[in-house]
Every structure is written in structure tokens, then in C-alpha cells.
Swiss-Prot record:
UniProt gene name: rps7
Assembly and binders: Part of the 30S ribosomal subunit.
SUPFAM superfamilies registered for this protein in UniProt: Ribosomal protein S7
A Pfam family that the UniProt record links to this protein: Ribosomal_S7
Record's GO cellular component terms: small ribosomal subunit
GO molecular function list: rRNA binding; structural constituent of ribosome
Gene3D superfamilies: Ribosomal protein S7 domain
Role played: One of the primary rRNA binding proteins, it binds directly to 16S rRNA where it nucleates assembly of the head domain of the 30S subunit. Is located at the subunit interface close to the decoding center.
Protein name: Small ribosomal subunit protein uS7
rRNA-binding in keyword set: yes
Any GO BP: translation
Length: 224
């Protein structure tokens, strides 16, 4: 296999998978093992085994590659659909680095997510990775609206949402809900994030992300 693609040097020990005609670079196989032969545990605690994505449309875009430290150093940013190969927990960590005053503070965001997963386990007794995946599935919208212009008049029409955008919106709303909960609130943000994940996984309307999904789908249904 060539070590370049589109004239760009690939990372060492990488391989290329193709989605149609689109090359997707993956640095190492998904069945990577540690020295003792066991799959890596997220944060040294949580197993990726038996984690199920119940929405078939999202399975292809949720990366559940076993990792201890979810940090890819931006190596997929220059590849089309590269974020489909970023561990899904890292995408959550990256979105916790907003707004601008938190930009670049990845270690802080990492600790927030790590503590939030501990709280999720204490509250539910379930694998927090599975709770997180269920939260994504329950908050990913299936319809949204777009504006079209016909005869000089703008109309709002309902359209289906692509799987990648469904995932992007779900992650955005989950992190927005955690920040909104912790604003002017003595409750720490990791506890707010844990509450948001638990509520979203249960499809509870108390979840900010669930309410946003229902609102968007209601507007889209009225625009059919």
C-alpha cells in the first residue's frame, strides 16, 4: 500500500479504508490489544465491549475503537469524513472546550468528562459508555428544516438529516445542556453533564438535548 494519498503523507502504521470512493485513514486496527491481550479500557476503567449502537444509521459514524486516552492530536482533520474515525468520547471532550474562554483547555475538559462518567456509573450502575451512546441515539434528530426560494418567496421545508449531522447536533446539544445547567449554579459542570447524559439516555424531557430534538422535529413536521 502506498504511504501517500492525494499527495499527502500518511501517519506511520496507518491503513486506508474506503467508503465508496472516499478514502478514510485509520492509524491502527480497531481490534487493537494491549500487552496482556486485553482490550484497552477507557480512562483505565470502562470497557468498550458489548457497547451497542441501537440506531443503524449512526453505527457507521460512531467510533467505538478501544482507547485508554481519547486524544488523536487532530490527525484526521484534513481528511473528508475524518471525524467518523475520531473516538466518540474525544468528540465529547472537544465540544466541552467551548465557549472561547475554554478553548485549548483539553486537560480540563478531559477531567470533566472523566468525572462525569464516574458519576453516571454511581447513579445508574451501567457502563457510562453505553449510557453516552444511548443519549446520542435519543437526541439525534431525524428531520430538520431548510429554506428554499421559489418565485422570490422563501419557504421553510422539512428535510431528512444526514447521519453525520445527526451525530453533530446530538453532541452539541448534550454539551450545551451541561453548560446551561452549570451557569450561575453551584452544581459542578461534571455533575451537570452526568445528569444530562442520564436524562437523555432515558429519553426524559428534562434533558435539554431531548427538548431541542423534539422542538426541531415538531417544527419540521409542521413544515412538510
Amino acid at each position: 500500500m502506498s504511504s501517500t494519498i492525494f499527495g499527502e503523507q500518511l501517519p506511520k502504521y496507518s491503513r486506508v479504508e474506503y467508503v465508496g470512493d472516499v478514502p478514510i485513514v485509520e492509524e491502527c486496527p480497531r481490534d487493537v490489544k494491549t500487552i496482556n491481550g486485553e482490550p484497552p479500557l477507557l480512562f483505565g476503567k470502562w470497557s468498550f465491549e458489548n457497547v451497542v449502537v441501537r440506531d443503524p444509521g449512526l453505527r457507521r459514524y460512531i467510533c467505538l475503537k478501544p482507547v485508554v486516552l481519547p486524544h488523536t492530536e487532530g490527525r484526521y482533520q484534513n481528511y473528508r469524513f475524518g471525524k467518523a474515525r475520531i473516538p466518540i468520547v474525544e468528540r465529547l471532550i472537544n465540544l466541552m472546550m467551548r465557549p472561547g474562554r475554554n478553548a485549548g483547555k483539553k486537560h480540563k475538559a478531559y477531567n470533566i468528562v472523566k468525572r462525569a462518567f464516574d458519576i453516571v456509573y454511581y447513579k445508574t450502575g451501567q457502563n457510562p459508555i453505553q449510557v453516552f451512546i444511548d443519549a446520542i441515539v435519543n437526541t439525534a434528530p431525524r428531520e430538520e428544516i431548510t429554506r428554499i426560494i421559489m418565485g422570490g418567496i422563501a419557504y421553510s421545508v422539512s428535510v431528512d438529516v444526514s447521519p453525520q449531522r445527526r451525530l453533530d447536533l446530538a453532541l452539541r446539544w448534550i454539551t450545551e445542556g451541561a453548560r446551561a445547567c452549570s451557569f450561575n449554579n453551584p452544581k459542578p459542570i461534571e455533575e451537570c453533564l452526568a445528569d444530562e447524559l442520564v436524562a437523555a439516555a432515558a429519553n426524559d424531557p428534562k434533558s435539554y438535548a431531548v427538548r431541542k430534538r423534539e422542538e426541531l422535529e415538531r417544527i419540521a413536521a409542521a413544515s412538510r
